[in-house]
């Protein structure tokens, strides 16, 4: 049926390692030419990091314009999130940035910016959902807002990514562009007479997903 938008992990790209690295490794393991990988996520991310500096489509001016601005990559202290975050750090470093990694409890936040071991970082990427920060760490949410307002640091996955991360964006898109070939019919209620999938607004990695049959019965 063609490509469909199922969700947009704008805030927490937790399938990045599988999509960018493991898929390529499987192709290589099975003697497929690596050029046949279906995506160029790794290379595209590298170029997008460079565009933070060039501020245009072309990345040829990166070396000329880059003045040593640093990116701090941070996650919770679990292996899966750390692996994904360190992959992003690796790509940014390969792009030409000065980078560092720290677990979130090692990062120093103040109205003056984002620090690790006393070093100020101009950019921050945090693999921690904004909704978790808002609910569980309200003071940090306020502080990060002050940091951005004071232009002391740029958060690479800013708070507005929460809107795109929500499954609710799929309903909005369907209402704006009904029957678009890249969209699936989406509603905040079960689709009458149709088999459908129920997802929470902020579900993670398939958690709390249910399959509803056309007769309304939940089969999974």
Where are the language model's segments positioned?
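Conserved metal-phosphate-binding beta-hairpin within the catalytic cores
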Residues: 1-12
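Domain-scale recognition of functional cores that engage charged ligands
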Residues: 15-18, 23-220
């Amino acid at each position: 049926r063609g490509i469909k938008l199922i969700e947009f992990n704008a805030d927490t790209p937790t399938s990045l390692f599988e999509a960018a690295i493991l898929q390529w490794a499987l192709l290589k393991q099975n003697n497929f030419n690596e050029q046949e990988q279906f995506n160029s996520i790794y290379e595209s991310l590298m170029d997008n990091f460079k565009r933070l500096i060039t501020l245009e489509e072309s990345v040829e001016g990166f070396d000329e314009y880059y003045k040593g601005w640093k990116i701090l990559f941070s996650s919770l202290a679990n292996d899966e999130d750390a692996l994904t975050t360190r992959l992003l750090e690796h790509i940014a470093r390969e792009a030409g940035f000065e980078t560092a990694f720290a677990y979130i409890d090692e990062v120093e936040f103040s109205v003056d910016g984002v620090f690790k071991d006393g070093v100020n970082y101009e950019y921050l990427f945090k693999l921690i959902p904004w909704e978790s920060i808002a609910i569980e760490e309200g003071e940090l949410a306020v502080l990060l807002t002050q940091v951005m307002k004071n232009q002391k640091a740029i958060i690479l996955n800013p708070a507005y990514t929460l809107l795109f991360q929500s499954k609710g964006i799929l309903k909005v898109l369907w209402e704006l562009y009904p029957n678009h070939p890249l969209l699936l019919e989406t509603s905040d209620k079960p689709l009458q007479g149709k088999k459908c999938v129920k997802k929470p607004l902020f579900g993670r990695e398939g958690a709390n997903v249910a399959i509803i049959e056309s007769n309304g019965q939940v089969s999974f």
